[in-house]
Amino acid sequence: SSDLMNIGLIAHDSKKKLMQNFCIAYRGILNKHELYATGTTGRLIEEVTNLNVHKYLAGHLGGQQQLASQIEHNDMDMVIYLRDPLHPKKHEPDVNDVVRLCDIYNIPFATNLATAELLIKALDRGDLEWREVYR
């Protein structure tokens, strides 16, 4: 199994249920790693999975900036950001700040379920061991 990785989880309101279902489905993989999430998303994940999640503030109250700061300190190995591409809410932070930082620090980043599943399966196979080089 792969080394301990730090995984960031963010979901817009309309995608929170999807994030819960994703974490239920991949609970056996996620429980081997450190999970970080914006406040409400983290609480909702914990409620349905019993996974331990480090919770930031709510996304619109600065939680997304807290996650971004962890990326800037090269202390994040993967980010799953389930966003609503059709109906973004005014209070929901812009995804682009996180995209930019993940590109700068070469961090695997998913914004939809298909890519998130590929990343989690790769993580479980040990395909992300190269991240160690960047730390």
Q: Model-derived features: where do they sit?
A:
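Short, acidic/small-residue loops that bind anionic groups at enzyme active sites
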Residues: 36, 99-119
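N-terminal phosphate-binding or glycine-rich loops at protein starts, especially the Walker A/P-loop
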Residues: 5-31
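Short internal beta-strands
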Residues: 32-41
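Short hydrophobic/aromatic-enriched beta-strand-loop microsegments
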Residues: 34, 51-61, 130-133
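Short, glycine-/small-residue-rich phosphate/pyrophosphate-handling segment
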Residues: 114-135
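Mid-chain, well-packed structural core segment of small domains
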Residues: 64-104
